[in-house]
Amino acid sequence: MTLPFSWITNDVSQCIDLTQDEHICSLSPVTDTEENMSAFKKSLFGKYDCSLNSEDQCLIVENGSSNFVTSKEAQKEAMKADSDICPPQQMAFNLFNETVVQKDMLNKEKFSHSASSNISNKDDAQYGIVTPVTEIPKQFRTVFKEFPYFNYIQSKALEHLLYSDRNFVLCAPTGSGKTVIFELAIIRLLMQVPMPWTNVKIVYMAPIKALCGQRYDDWKAKFGPVGLNCKELTGDTEMDDLFEIQHAHIIMTTPEKWDSMTRKWKDNTLVQLVRLFLIDEVHILKEENRGATLEVVVSRMKTIYSLSHLSEDRKAFIPMRFVAVSATIPNVEDIADWLSDENSPGVCMKMDESSRPVKLRKVVLGFPCSTKQSEFKFDLTLNYKIANIIQTYSDGRPTLVFCSTRKGVQQAASILTKDAKFVMSIEHKQRLQKCANSIKDSKLRDVLQYGVGYHHAGVDISDRKVIENSFLIGDLPVLFTTSTLAMGVNLPAHLVIVKSTMHYVSGMFQEYSETDILQMIGRAGRPQFDSTATAVIMTRLSTKEKYVHMLDGADTIESSLHKHLVEHLNAEIALHTITDVKVALEWIRSTFLYIRALKNPAYYGFSEGLDKIGIEAKLQELCLKNLNDLSSLGLIKMDEEINFKPTETGKLMALYYIAFNTAKLFHTIRGTETLAELVSLISSCSEFSDVQLRANERRVLNTLNKDKNRVTIRYPMEGKIKTKEMKVNCLIQAHLGCILVQDFSLTQDISKIFRHGTRLAKCLSEFLALQENKFSAFLNALILTKCFKSKLWENSSHISKQLEKIGVTLANAMVNAGLTTFKKIEDTNARELELIVNRHPPFGNQIKESVAHLPKYEIKFQQLAKYRATTAEVVLTVLLTNFKQLQKKRTAPDSHFVMLVIGDDDNQAIFKQKIMDSSLFKTGSWTRKIEIKRASKSTNVCLNLISSEYVGLDIQQSFNICYLGSDSFNADLVTQHKSENIFSQEIYKTSTKTKDIADTNWSMRQTAIKCATRECNHNCKNKDACGHECCKVGVSEKAEMKTNFYSYLNDLRTRNSVSSATPVKRLKMQMEAETRNVNLQNFVFTPKPSIRSPCLKIPENILLQAESSVLTNKYKASHQEETCCKYEIKGCGEKQTKGMPKKTCERRNLTDSDKCNSSSSENAAYVTFDLGNDIWDDFDDDNLLDASNISSLTDQHTSEFTDVSFSKNQPVSKSSLSAGHHEEARYNAMSINKDSYRYLNAKSEVFSQENTQCIDVVPSNQKLHGKMFSENTIKHMFTLQEETNYPVTSKMDSPHNGCWSSNIFFKTPENKTQERGCYHQEDETNAFIGIFNGIF
């Protein structure tokens, strides 16, 4: 018996009943060969129109030809592919003509265009026919490779999805395989469009990002081999990456993101390419925020489709199709009516719980709760009842418990471990112990050993992965989690418990939404393991009936668009979708609000009993009220005929997706707000309403706000953190100040805050740019926008954090090393950078290269010689100094630009210009002539060049404009150029009060003062009008004393620049506070008075004469110290005349601090820890041991050093060797004989002290040649020794004579054996061992 269809002529919808008689079917594998592919099945893949002629036959139209097929013939054709499948007793294929349905609908007075299929027969659902995967074309079967047959719900929907293009809505319980419904619709579209499918796009929309991410991973693996590209477009996606969507076939997005994007794509053809729109969890229409957004987005897509298909070729045109799935709801027909249009009525299919693959048992438990008991205490009492519920309903299988808060998750897990144990065996315990050893969280590790775990967003990612894997494989019997897991991670369980139906949102407790409840209980049932599952909801006795009603699917879905109509009306007006009241009403008719207002007007505040005309009048009145609100803020313009035009402000609000309350907040700006006030204003925006202030976060936030022992935020707030606005403000400042926040939940909040904050700050800056009299606030808004994008304050020292591969840790290391500007980083040696950040080469070269390829700007400001009393003409020039270097490589993105802003003391924005880097790459400059009007307060103008993304590239200059009759007509222009880290103080703030004006002028003067100047100490009342030049330009500051470490780094750079290899030895410098002010005078050697030797008989008068001669020569030498020149061993070339001694003073190897100290102690011994550049080149340690073999030096260069008399064993100082010319006169003036031997000893002592301060440096690339001694000198010295028979040991050999300069190396003789015979045995005991100057 063939089941007839019937038209239901009520004013709800038309229903097509496709329920079938009970039948049993056996399944066997099916092969899809060419022979088995019947003509009937082939006809289903083409476009067709069908009309029902009689009960027993239907008309099939294919390619213009018609064939009549009886129901029995159709049945045979359908089952011809597999003879093993038992057909039903009677089966009818009812294919309906869409035009006939349309005519019938127009003839009847009703508001519905949809057809509904009610499938509720339990026996039919259990034993009905299921379709094999081979029903679809072979090239797409890999999408369903995980199963050979579609389930009953999928099989029933396949006929409408695969063989027609009508809009489709499925209402089925959770866990019934609704994802396959979308995949069948995708395959239908691919069958219609030839490869490579470049002109079609598919949009999948889900309420949350977690579902989009799951679907992206799933479909990328399934449809990737077929040839489709998938792209995820959510709130985490950067706006600069949207060009990738142009090459994507399937786009996963959320309603909010798609709404924001389509507001920008009015003229873009990308939206017009969308041919399939998939809506998951469509029952979120009842949610207040997401529901309104989803409703507007679908209505907008319908409008775009209706406008675009008019210009398309009707033969090749593919209509836009909507496919939506929903949980069990009673009024799913209303959704189908909403998605339908006059030409394509939608199909609605309803499935009951009996068709669920895993049967779900739903239990609602009510617990008593007094009115005095808080929600926190009630939630705590439920923790002690969980053990009994698990024991009753779990059957020893995995259990998932949902809690409202993170703290509640941990508390419930801890209590359960005390009440029950879930370890089954020793092996089970060992596996749990192994998992616990890999857990970082100590509390989680403790409970995991008892078979209980917890999972929420605050848990470390690695710990979450371990917990998820343990639960999936069955090692973890009980898992506690928050409700966010129900939306994000797919962890099915046999038993699901919802502990309390209240959760803490926006500072108050609220009931879970129906979507949240359905998602949580939808986790019950594992198709691969279970045939049944259980869901338990724990709630109050007072709300028990509510959730029983909800689980039965009796809650009607209502629209929430009327609560947010004002923002969406503004968006549609900005897109020119709505131009007048008549068009606005037409747009309202395309919404779900209109469908439900006709059926339930009382819910929307309309009177009962209104007809269609009355309801439309009420909707028109609602539109006019919201349009007046938009007009009052200047977001739209309305004329007398009630035509609408968007304003620039209204376009900004629509473009940046700004709430209406936020727009009202922006209109309260006075124009003199500081940076701190703008941060506070943005923190109060409605976009942060979902940020929660948790009790366990207050301590961390208060520490960030005020703490004496730690780094705090830049602008501390008064009192403690008590509101969510204060929390947002604190987190913004902490992140901009590079203050580490270790709390994971706060880190997630920061990510959300900066995502919204960047958008809000950009909108605020463009909003203030439209107003000429708010220069100060506009400039601070530009700076704040850059701060949000770079995540740094505008005066931050952590500018290196903006470079690639440098995070907070490495940026802190560079700040500690003094690298706080891009210029300092660029001037630092690459190897030194690697030492600072502890990285291997070529990391330093990469950092320097990145900085070198950043844009470098300069500004030139020239006033033309056309002086007037009220106006002045100036020429502005912006130079890109390294534009040739940037032709090859650029660090900044192509979208980088600078904003040129000029303002005066009247807070007027004189000039604004956006300059793209791409325009500067051509010629390297940008020039513009502008006219400046004279301000009433002063003639100063402030010029600012603000980078769009980088901190450290901004330029600020202040100019004094000359006008006729001005006091400063002939004054010099005061300029300031800052190439890094400008704006150390706030942009000046103006006010009407005299005191505020004075503060403004002071701030402007601060801008004019250069970096190396300070404000003078004059107490002038008006420093702009006084006669002191220092009041306007400042007073130069003294240069700071450079530290020992700075000198050490400079010396390290110098040595590194000339050294080809790393030094073999290094002398570590001791960084102590005391070493900076060491008085080297304390280390001067004071010789003891000479004692006459009994062996020498020298007359007293000779000694007195000798001592007097020494003092005389010492005085002459000190008198000419100021005019002495510096000599190198290579030679100065000039000889002293008239026997006047000349003292050499070489200080090239001294550090800055040593130079300062040495100047104060002229006669003190100089001690340095600096090895110098000359120490390491051509140096041989082995040859130093033969320092006594100096005879080989006596035969060379005898002409330059003549008549210099030394004791043979007397150590020769470096100064005496290198400055031989002027010391020669001193020694030739003395006659050395037998009686003056002691005189020579005394003179040597004084001489060694005298020449300690004056040393020469041996160049690192030269070897010291032995040209120190003349033959006469050596001969005279040996003769003197033989005549006196005095021991060769001299007093200068004493180790106490450390004042001798020893910064010299002796060249080892080439033939040591030959030279060694020229020495006495005593010579070997007097070896010169000194190596480093000043050490011994």
Swiss-Prot record:
Query: What are the UniProt keywords, alphabetically?
Result: ATP-binding, Helicase, Hydrolase, Isomerase, Meiosis, Metal-binding, Nucleotide-binding, Zinc, Zinc-finger
Q: Which Pfam families match?
A: DEAD, Helicase_C, Sec63, SNRNP200_wHTH
Query: Species name for this entry?
Result: Xenopus tropicalis (Western clawed frog)
Protein known as: Probable ATP-dependent DNA helicase HFM1
Please give the Gene3D superfamilies that the UniProt record associates with this protein: P-loop containing nucleotide triphosphate hydrolases (3.40.50.300), Sec63 N-terminal domain-like domain (1.10.3380.10), Winged helix-like DNA-binding domain superfamily/Winged helix DNA-binding domain (1.10.10.10)
Zinc fingers (C4-type), renumbered ranges? 1016-1031
- The residues listed in the UniProt record as binding ATP, with positions renumbered to this chain, are A172, P173, T174, G175, S176, G177, K178, T179
Record family assignment: Belongs to the helicase family. SKI2 subfamily.
Catalytic activity field: Couples ATP hydrolysis with the unwinding of duplex DNA by translocating in the 3'-5' direction; ATP + H2O = ADP + phosphate + H(+)
EC assignment: 5.6.2.4
What is this protein's function per UniProt? Required for crossover formation and complete synapsis of homologous chromosomes during meiosis.
Domain called SEC63: residue spans: 646-961
Any one biological process term the GO annotation gives: meiotic cell cycle
Instruction: Write out the GO MF terms.
Output: ATP binding; ATP hydrolysis activity; helicase activity; nucleic acid binding
Q: Start and end of every Helicase C-terminal domain?
A: 388-589
Cofactor binding note from Swiss-Prot or TrEMBL:
Might have a zinc-finger.
Can you give the residue ranges of the Helicase ATP-binding domain? 159-347
Q: Which PANTHER family match?
A: HELICASE FOR MEIOSIS 1, HFM1, ATP DEPENDENT DNA HELICASE HOMOLOG
